[in-house]
């Protein structure tokens, strides 16, 4: 799968841009602030309806415009000429819209799963060093990329959680005296939260089990050490007997989702008094964390900058390989990656991804990108994307 043409209208800094692409490597070269990342961000948005740079869509619409349009022609594969035209209209004042082959979709999220991407950028350092929310976002993003229907599950969970929190807040401070007011209403929300939450948690655990052995292999390939990278899942729900941390890639027994939902419900019941006092839900995936290790030590707080960077990159490369193992050929985006790597790690990274259907690279300096990934190159600057003329070789 690869993007063979990208068109932007009023997206970020671009009034308009038309960019032909090809399978293999494409590199966008330009100084910082010239718009090269905007191009790969647009490809990411077509794939995920989100950006790795911002939490809402407002900055994606060019200042002074009412809407932005991202349009991409996606080809099925290097040996498959079938293609689809994907289009997303990002509106500043009303709901976004999406189309496939000019036909409008009922909901924008129906476009998810047509184009798959794996994006690595300097922001990914937060997955290793940042807050639990950064690691949850990474894992949930991979879950939705694997199974696009999980976007609706996640949305449903967030809706129920919001409504349950509103109920708890209205009863906050009443403690045990609120029991008569809660009655069946709280039980209904608990059941719905546990059922949907168990589905989301099960998908997270399955994905973590699958991606970590691949991440460990990628880390050893990139870093000049042979440390094993592992992960454990810190849950508010007792997972003993249901799931154990992944060590090696081997077939695992599917998680008993019914038992997981029952444990979720039991934990909610035990924490209800505390929740009534605090006015917020204290149990569920929104409270969980993924603990990453390099060797015997937790990466957060102990790993060096170089180790953290290598682990963050390995997580994305593991994600890329997992999707390929699932039968999906994603577009790989390496946004300002090579400037942070020494020559040895650059070459190792390039060698590990060169066989991808499509690799989109951004760089301030052309010489940072290994020769085997040069491929098609563009100069980016002044709101234009032009054929490369060698102005940023040093």
Swiss-Prot record:
This is DNA replication and repair protein RecF. The RecF protein is involved in DNA metabolism; it is required for DNA replication and normal SOS inducibility. RecF binds preferentially to single-stranded, linear DNA. It also seems to bind ATP. It comes from Cutibacterium acnes (strain DSM 16379 / KPA171202). Belongs to the RecF family. GO terms for cellular component: cytoplasm. GO terms for molecular function: ATP binding; single-stranded DNA binding. ATP binds at residues 30-37. The lineage of its organism: Bacteria, Bacillati, Actinomycetota, Actinomycetes, Propionibacteriales. Its main location: cytoplasm. InterPro entries: DNA-binding_RecF, DNA-binding_RecF_CS, P-loop_NTPase, RecF/RecN/SMC_N, RecF_2. Keywords: ATP-binding, Cytoplasm, DNA damage, DNA repair, DNA replication, DNA-binding, Nucleotide-binding, SOS response.
């Amino acid at each position: 799968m690869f993007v063979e043409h990208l068109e932007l209208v009023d997206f970020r800094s671009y009034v308009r841009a038309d960019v032909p692409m090809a399978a293999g490597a494409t590199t966008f070269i330009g100084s910082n602030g010239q718009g090269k990342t905007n191009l790969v961000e647009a490809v990411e948005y077509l794939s995920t309806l989100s950006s790795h740079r911002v939490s809402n869509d407002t900055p994606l619409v060019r200042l002074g415009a009412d809407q932005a349009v991202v349009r991409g022609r996606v080809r099925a594969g290097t040996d498959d000429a079938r293609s689809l035209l994907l289009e997303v209209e990002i509106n500043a004042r009303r709901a976004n819209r999406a189309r496939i082959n000019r036909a409008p979709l009922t909901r924008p999220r129906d476009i998810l799963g047509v184009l798959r991407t794996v994006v690595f950028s300097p922001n990914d350092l937060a997955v290793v060093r940042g807050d639990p929310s950064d690691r949850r976002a990474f894992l949930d993003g991979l879950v939705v990329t694997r199974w696009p229907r999980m976007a609706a599950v996640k949305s449903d969970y967030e809706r129920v959680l919001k409504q349950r929190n509103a109920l708890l807040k209205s009863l906050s401070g009443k403690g045990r005296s609120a029991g008569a007011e809660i009655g069946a209403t709280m039980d209904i929300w608990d059941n719905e939260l546990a059922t949907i939450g168990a589905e989301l948690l099960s998908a997270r655990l399955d994905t973590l089990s699958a991606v970590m052995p691949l991440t460990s292999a990628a880390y050893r390939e990139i870093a000049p050490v042979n440390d094993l990278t592992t992960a454990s899942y810190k849950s508010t729900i007792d997972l003993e007997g249901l799931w154990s941390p992944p060590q090696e890639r081997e077939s695992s027994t599917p998680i008993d989702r019914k038992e997981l939902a029952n444990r979720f419900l039991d934990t909610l019941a035990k924490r209800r008094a505390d929740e009534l006092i605090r006015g917020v839900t204290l149990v569920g995936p929104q409270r969980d964390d993924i603990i990453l290790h390099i060797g015997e030590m937790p990466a957060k707080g102990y790993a060096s900058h170089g180790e953290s960077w290598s682990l963050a990159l390995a997580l994305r490369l593991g994600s890329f390989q997992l999707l390929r193992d699932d039968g999906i050929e994603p577009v790989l985006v390496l946004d300002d990656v090579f400037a942070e790597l020494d020559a040895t790690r650059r070459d190792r990274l390039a060698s590990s991804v060169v066989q991808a259907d499509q690799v989109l690279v951004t760089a301030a300096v052309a010489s940072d990108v290994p020769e085997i990934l040069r491929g098609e190159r563009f100069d980016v600057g002044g709101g234009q994307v032009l054929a490369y003329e060698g102005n940023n070789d040093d």
